């Protein structure tokens, strides 16, 4: 069975891992980094992903960041003169990760386990699966990020029982999960979180502070200047990271804008104390989900054995202190918070292929599921933190006499009224025989699969007629849209491959020209005139082809030059070998003379 890669598709950074033997290994990107910025930019018709895209974010307005925050919505982003869905942009990131994983493995990759925040709803999970499909990946499993982290943490601890709390604060989302580990079973007891809280929010606090201070001093609002704002974002992220290691950092942005008197510069120092003050409310928001998860798991703090920190934002000292204060425990630092989720996803891939044995993952649904009933009430069929996959049925009836049809309004959330929860979809069960209200028996069944994706069935128990749908959110993509996007992605991949081939050829040509010119110079006056002239002629022809830019001509002339250069190199080698042989012969003769002299015995002359 081919390898299943594990992908952590993050808001600010993503990572890919693969199982090698029994070890999960992070695959470095082409720049040698173990995580890849979740950034996509467009330039001259080319799609650029990762570090290169992030570097040009300041100067290139066609750059998309933090697309994960829009997953599961109908919101589109404009770039490159086109509109893109969040699924398409995410697919470009996935395609890039897939590409360099294939380069590392030396084989095609077609399957993946992709992680999502535990608190992602059905629409967001479906959007993630669609993004994988567009990228040419069969998504074998959608796994909650804290669960994947626990899997990586607990793989070598299957012989002992423990309860762990995973505190996962990423770039754009926050999750808390409580798991019980024992005998290879990873059982999620409860999960809670906030999909609108992450490292980006901490950056934004610094940006707002810098904008306000600059406006106070210079009367100019930098938030209205797109390029200045991007520079502020980069500076804020760097300052945040600096303050995890030092207590004060300098923010220096020369020529940030211009005033009536000329260019203006932003120079400001930011202390950790000030940063903590600016972000106090964000840190405070992490506490409620921790308490909620403990309450749902029916556990006290004393029953938690370990606290695992996941996500780059858990490096913020105030966050670490808040976790200590809230749990009464020193966090376990045995895992890398940036890499552990992708590693866990790769382990789950190994479970699916059978390479990892005796491991069972029992995940939960993060939000309650149900339907709208009379009076706009939300009636739950499946409570949050129910282990998945699961199925639950309940019988309902009509609200009016002779009602011919019932509308099934499917919802996800925790509020008592339907209007306050997230609509997953609507469908209708028709042709109900005429009967007084309350008589028809309508059985509604909810199914949640292992990926947390929902399907609903309504059945008239009198006529046995049923209606069945896999929930597609109003913001989701149709199969036709997914197919079109897959074709676009394939076309882009072909164009990218062609572009890479062109670049490789041009580099090869440059290298061949440089090497041949060097050889011709070195062999001047050494008697290889025929071979040197042939190589020079082939070199001139290749340079002319290079000037014209005709790739086929360049390829042909490169082959011709390589042939002539090889002939010249052979002559050089033969001459060098002959010279070496002659030198060895001379040494041999000298050695013989020395040996003959050794036979002469010195006599002693005595005068009489």
Curated annotation (Swiss-Prot):
SUPFAM superfamilies: Actin-like ATPase domain (SSF53067), Heat shock protein 70kD (HSP70), C-terminal subdomain (SSF100934), Heat shock protein 70kD (HSP70), peptide-binding domain (SSF100920)
Pfam families in the cross-refs: HSP70
Induction summary: By stress conditions e.g. heat shock.
Biased composition (Acidic residues): 599-608
Region entry Disordered, spans: 576-608
Modified residues (Phosphothreonine): 173
InterPro entries, sorted: ATPase_NBD, Chaperone_DnaK, Heat_shock_70_CS, HSP70_C_sf, HSP70_peptide-bd_sf, Hsp_70_fam
Signal peptide positions (record): none
Assigned keywords, A-Z: ATP-binding, Chaperone, Nucleotide-binding, Phosphoprotein, Stress response
Source organism, top-level taxon: Bacteria
CDD domains, sorted: ASKHA_NBD_HSP70_DnaK-like (cd10234)
Biased composition annotated in UniProt, kind: Low complexity: 576-598
GO molecular function: ATP binding; ATP-dependent protein folding chaperone; unfolded protein binding
Function as written in the Swiss-Prot or TrEMBL entry: Acts as a chaperone.
NCBIfam families (alphabetical): PRK00290.1, prok_dnaK
Family membership noted in the UniProt record: Belongs to the heat shock protein 70 family.
Entry protein name: Chaperone protein DnaK
Organism: Streptococcus pyogenes serotype M12 (strain MGAS2096)
